[in-house]
Design a protein with these regions (language model features):
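C-terminal helix/juxtamembrane-tail motif
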Residues: 2-4, 133-156
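A generic structural micro-feature
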Residues: 3-5, 50-52, 65-69, 95-99, ...
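Hydrophobic ligand-binding cavity/cleft-lining segments
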Residues: 1-53
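Structural signal for hydrophobic/aromatic residues that build the beta-strand cores
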Residues: 22, 26, 58, 75, ...
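Hydrophobic/aromatic beta-strand elements that line small-molecule binding cavities or substrate pockets
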Residues: 11-13, 71-77, 101-109
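Glycine-rich portal/gate segments that line the openings of hydrophobic small-molecule binding cavities
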Residues: 36, 43-95, 153
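Beta-strand/loop substructures that line and gate deep hydrophobic ligand-binding cavities in soluble
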Residues: 86-141
């Protein structure tokens, strides 16, 4: 990757959910994501493979920037020990601006609740494209919405 075009951004969000519960929702039960955070991700479609398997291809319908954006991604890796999942963008709106883009989510247990870290690794198509810093707020909103829903479910 060219150093002037490549980048990495991260954000960490504290949540009340257990690390395992958040990880399972975000890595193992993707089909439930629209129920957990309908304001951020109203729809997700399985295009190829099986939901829980590396290599599966999904279309994420993101409510982002005042419109619905589609991101076609491959489920690249999952690590049950590190509570980490990586998705690589292979189509959709992001390929209009980025040569490569990965979404990495990792959850860290805390005494109470957990810490969710989102990392974006990317290479822009050209220097005129801004770094995707606004996606950090999207990640924070998404994380809080999932957490709120998981907490409501756990109290039922």
């Amino acid at each position: 990757m060219s150093s002037s075009l490549s980048g990495k951004l991260s954000i960490e969000i504290e949540v009340k959910s257990s690390a395992r519960a958040f990880y399972e929702a975000n890595a193992k039960r993707l089909y439930e994501i629209p129920k957990l955070c309908p304001n951020c991700i109203p729809r997700i479609d399985l295009v190829e493979g099986k939901w829980e398997e590396v290599g599966a291809v999904v279309n994420w319908h993101l409510a982002y920037g005042g419109k619905t954006v589609i991101s076609k991604e491959i489920y690249e890796s999952i690590d049950d020990e590190k509570l980490s999942v990586t998705f690589k963008v292979i189509g959709g709106s992001f390929v209009e601006s980025f040569k490569s883009f990965k979404f990495i989510s990792q959850v860290f247990p805390k005494k109470e609740g957990s810490l969710v870290r989102w990392t974006y690794e990317y290479e822009k198509l050209n220097a005129d494209i801004p770094d995707p810093k606004d996606l950090l707020q999207f990640a924070a909103d998404l994380t809080r919405e999932i957490d709120d829903t998981l907490m409501k479910i756990s109290q039922e």
